[in-house]
Structures are given as structure tokens and as C-alpha cells.
Amino acid sequence: MSNMPDQRRGPWSAGEDQRLIKLVKDLGPGNWVNVARILGTRTPKQCRERWHQNLKPGLNHGPMTQEEAAIIVREVDLKGPRWADIARKLQGRSDNAVKNYWNGLNNRKKNQLRRQSAPRRVSASDVLRSSPGQLPRAHMQRPIRYPQDIYTGSRRPSSPSSFNDSLHHRVHESIEWFPSRPQQQQQQQQQQARCTTPFTSFYPPSHAFPTTDGYQDGSDGPTGSTLRLLTPPTSRRLAPFSTLPSPTTSSIGDLDEFDRRQLAAFAPPAAYRRPSLPFPQQSSMGYLPSATEYLPTAPSSPIALIQRDEKNHARIPVTSLLCS
């Protein structure tokens, strides 16, 4: 046993085949132990199988004929996979060749059944060449895939009426998100009322705040026609100069020269006067009047202002007027 060569795996080379044929001719086809010992690269079993399956004279390596295929099918149905017995009934066929043919035949049958059971794919050329009544049966019997319903989780509706009802429900629900035009206008009016109510309650329209940062009609100094008067942000208006509180006549004599010049600076010349406008109407936006709606007509002099206003207004010091 120590002289037995190690088993070598893999395909046989051409040199090994030539040496095996020569050794079998010299030693005989039954002395496989000595053949393997002399060959030195294969075991006795490998040498025997190689000779009977591939190198034996008289073996037919061509394709199987129809008569041979029928014999193989009949013998396998009767006896099962007894490849050596089946090979003896065939002239020049080895048991390994019979086994390989049977396995290949089974694989071809399985692939054919798999192709027949699979649905046929219809190409664009087949559709153009055939009429609507001649379409393949597999294409006509393909089930329709409905989109999954997000409400019920099902893909196929139970009936056409239920499908129409669910569609109508989705459309009606989507329309409810968009309010009608009268409802939208009413919501805008309520929102405008909420925005303007706090300012109008705290700041009446007649209240004004004199500033000296700019003047109407592009004037560059205190000699401009009108003093810019600021109101709350919701309604920028120019209040008439006559609405300002009037100083008392007793306080006129207490004014020094500086106060008199300051008071006279607020009286524009008569050339820049403009006629008073009536009470402003609501603008197109509903609550933002134009800045030119209140254009005052100032008196010609501070003395005339005092004489006119002391009859109608409360008497307050002039210093409070200048400080405000």
C-alpha cells in the first residue's frame, strides 16, 4: 500500500491517456493495480473508469440516435437509473454516456415546461401586426392592477358603484379645503377689522403728531406749505393745523422773541395754501387712506390763529403746544 500513488484530481492530460493505453495493452485490461503503480499519477479506480468510459476501443462518442434514445427512456421507466445494464443493450455506449444523456434530456424537458407556463410577453410589433380580436390569450387574461386605496387598504374595488362612491368622496373632501368666494371675502374683512380696531381705539383720526423731519410738496425748510403730521401706522394722515389746541390770550404776552419766531415758522405764506378737502373716504383697500386726503389750510398769521381758535377751543398754555 505504501507504493500506491496519491490520488490526483482533475482532468486527464493527453500524455496520461497515451501511457494508460500502452500499459493496458501490455498488462491487460484487468490489472489496474499494476497499471496505476507504473503510471504513478492515478489510482486504480481512476485508471479503470478512464479506460471503460473514454479510452476503450469500439466506444461510440457520437450523438444518440432516436432508437437509442427510445431504449434509454423505456429502460429507465422499467428498471430505473441502472446505467450499466442499460449500456449493455446499446452498441458501443458506456454507462457514463447513457447517464449524461438522460440527465440532459430531463433538463431540456424542465426548461420547456417552464417556458410554456410563463406568460408570453407581447411586443409592439405583435400588437401592430394583429387585430384587437387576435391578441394573445395570455395578454387578454392578464388581471388589471388597481391602485391601492389609502382608506380601505384594498387594491380592487368590490363593485363599480363602491368605486364611484369612494371617488366622489375624495373629490368632495378635496373641495372642502378651498372656501368659496363670499366666505373668503368675509374672512378677509374680519381679519382687517381685527388689525385696525386696536389702533383706531387708542388713536382717533384727529390726533396728530408734528414732526420736523420733512415737509409736504417737496419743501426743504420750515417755510413749507404744510407740516407733515403723523398718525398711527394704519392711517397716515395730515391733520389740519386748525385742529391743534389754541393757547390762551393771557399767555401770548409771556412769549419771548424765540417762541414768537418758532410759532411764526409754522404759518406758511398764503401762496402755498390749498383748499381743505372733505372727510376722506375709505380707500380701495378698506382701511388705508391716501396721504393727500388731509391737506390743511393754515391761517395767514399766528395772531389770526389765536383769535380764531380762542372762541372754540379750550385755553391751554402755548408751551404745551410747542412741547407736544
From Swiss-Prot:
Major site of localization recorded for this protein: nucleus
Gene Ontology BP terms: mitotic cell cycle; positive regulation of transcription by RNA polymerase II
Keyword Membrane in annotation: no
Organism, as annotated: Neurospora crassa (strain ATCC 24698 / 74-OR23-1A / CBS 708.71 / DSM 1257 / FGSC 987)
Gene name tied to this protein: rca-1
Protein name: Myb-like DNA-binding protein myb-1
Swiss-Prot/TrEMBL keywords: DNA-binding, Nucleus, Repeat
Residue ranges of every copy of the HTH myb-type domain listed in the record: 4-59, 60-110
Keyword RNA-binding: no
Stretches that traverse the bilayer: none
